[in-house]
């Protein structure tokens, strides 16, 4: 019986070896086809490249970038708004200047002269007769200058949107940087708008744009 079973075991072992070799060859062919044809689900996923900020290409560009950061820090830390109260929103603007909110701690100080201001807060309803005065005051402000539209009336006319004597948004007269919704918006909303303006100034790259020209 042992003599009869030995050839059977040998043939079974040979068949198993052939099947394993065939499987290995088939797997190698699959990997080769994947490598030649393109990516597939059988390949392990490659790690994604991390988002890295581009480094300055030269020493001059690096110096200009750091100088830009310094100037932006100085600008956003000393915003001097021009008081341009037109309606009830100006009461909330004055509320922000009161000791409860104390906007001076953010470097925001009201100025009465447009030549000493770099921010204009349009608070209230802008009429057609007041529009030329608004533009004239804006032109007298030194560069860079920013405009904050406070309230629904300044944003788009608000309650008086269909009136014949009201401008439907002060952005038709001057370019606006920050819009503050509300009728009227609270002092907290105005303070939040000022903080958003500071964040916008922080992202400016005026010197870098000038340097790359």
Curated annotation (Swiss-Prot):
Q: Which GO terms describe its cellular component?
A: mitochondrial inner membrane; respiratory chain complex I
In the UniProt record, the transit peptide is located at: 1-38
Q: In which residues is [4Fe-4S] cluster bound?
A: 88-89, 153, 183
Question: What's the EC number here?
Answer: 7.1.1.2
Q: Which domain of life is it from?
A: Eukaryota
Chain spans, region Disordered: 33-53
Question: Any idea which residues bear Hydroxyarginine here?
Answer: 111
Catalytic activities: a ubiquinone + NADH + 5 H(+)(in) = a ubiquinol + NAD(+) + 4 H(+)(out)
InterPro entries (alphabetical): NADH_UbQ_OxRdtase-like_20kDa, NADH_UQ_OxRdtase_20Kd_su
Look up and give the membrane topology term.
Answer: Peripheral membrane protein
- Posttranslational modification, per the record? Hydroxylated ar Arg-111 by NDUFAF5 early in the pathway of assembly of complex I, before the formation of the juncture between peripheral and membrane arms.
Needed co-factor(s): [4Fe-4S] cluster
Q: How does it assemble?
A: Core subunit of respiratory chain NADH dehydrogenase (Complex I) which is composed of 45 different subunits. This is a component of the iron-sulfur (IP) fragment of the enzyme.
Would you tell me the protein name for this molecule? NADH dehydrogenase [ubiquinone] iron-sulfur protein 7, mitochondrial
- The organism of origin for this protein: Pongo abelii
């Amino acid at each position: 019986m042992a003599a009869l079973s030995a050839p059977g075991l040998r043939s079974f072992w040979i068949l198993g070896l052939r099947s394993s070799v065939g499987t290995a060859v088939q797997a190698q062919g699959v990997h080769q086809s994947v490598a030649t044809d393109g990516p597939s689900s059988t390949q392990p996923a490659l790690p994604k490249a991390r988002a890295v900020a581009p480094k300055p290409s030269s020493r001059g560009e690096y110096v200009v970038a750091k100088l830009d950061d310094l100037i932006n820090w100085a600008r956003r830390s000393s915003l001097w708004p021009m008081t341009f109260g037109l309606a009830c929103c100006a009461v909330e603007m004055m509320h922000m200047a009161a000791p409860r909110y104390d906007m001076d701690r953010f470097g925001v100080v009201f100025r009465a002269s447009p030549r000493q201001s770099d921010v204009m807060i349009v608070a209230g309803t802008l009429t057609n007769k007041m529009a030329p005065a608004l533009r004239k005051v804006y032109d007298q402000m030194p560069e860079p200058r920013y405009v904050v539209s406070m309230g629904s009336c300044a944003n788009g006319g608000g309650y008086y949107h269909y009136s014949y004597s009201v401008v439907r948004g002060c952005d038709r007269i001057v370019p606006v940087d920050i819009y503050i919704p509300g009728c009227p918006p609270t002092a907290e909303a105005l303070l939040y708008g000022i903080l958003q303006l500071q964040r916008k100034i922080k992202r400016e790259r005026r010197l870098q744009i000038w340097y790359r020209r």
